Amino acid sequence: QGWPGPKVPP
């Protein structure tokens, strides 16, 4: 799942 940041996890 994504989050507000430069990278997104699964």
Swiss-Prot record:
Belongs to the bradykinin-potentiating peptide family. Keywords: Hypotensive agent, Metalloenzyme inhibitor, Metalloprotease inhibitor, Protease inhibitor, Pyrrolidone carboxylic acid, Secreted, Toxin. GO terms for cellular component: extracellular region. It is found in: Secreted. The modification Pyrrolidone carboxylic acid is found at Q1. Expressed by the venom gland. One of its GO terms (biological process) is regulation of blood pressure. The keyword Magnesium does not apply. This peptide both inhibits the activity of the angiotensin-converting enzyme (ACE) and enhances the action of bradykinin by inhibiting the peptidases that inactivate it. It acts as an indirect hypotensive agent. This is Bradykinin-potentiating peptide. One of its GO terms (molecular function) is toxin activity. The keyword Secreted applies.
